[in-house]
């Protein structure tokens, strides 16, 4: 049984009208079940088949589903759940195939907390630490860190953990200590080009 990776994909189209067209096109690929499967109409394989971007759906990784798609301004937003890692090939190559005369910018961030896997091609997230406070029972630590999931810069996180542990240890040592003593996952967003996930 895989761990599930949640990926937020943002497609910059340049115009609101084109964003609406792209969003509608992606949605239309999910209305028809191109291949029998256990995921339903929103299976990534249906997108691969119905977009006509692939001779066979097996030519692309598609173990997952498109959970949501919407246009907002000049951008199209997609939420994808997939096994272990991002699987964006069906959508990205499908859109490029459907709109060959257009050039799009693709930005994504993906998280699979079970394996502390966080990757992105967004420069503003790279190097930020993702703090997952789910399950922290230590009230004093929760008070310092705050409740919820969020991204934090190195300086802030170092200050909070050094204050909590009354220590001047390095951030890496403190993160290991928090994981061991509190079961908290703190890891940083790594840069990974989108090409790594559209094969």
PLM features: residue spans?
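Long, contiguous binding/interaction regions
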Residues: 1-199
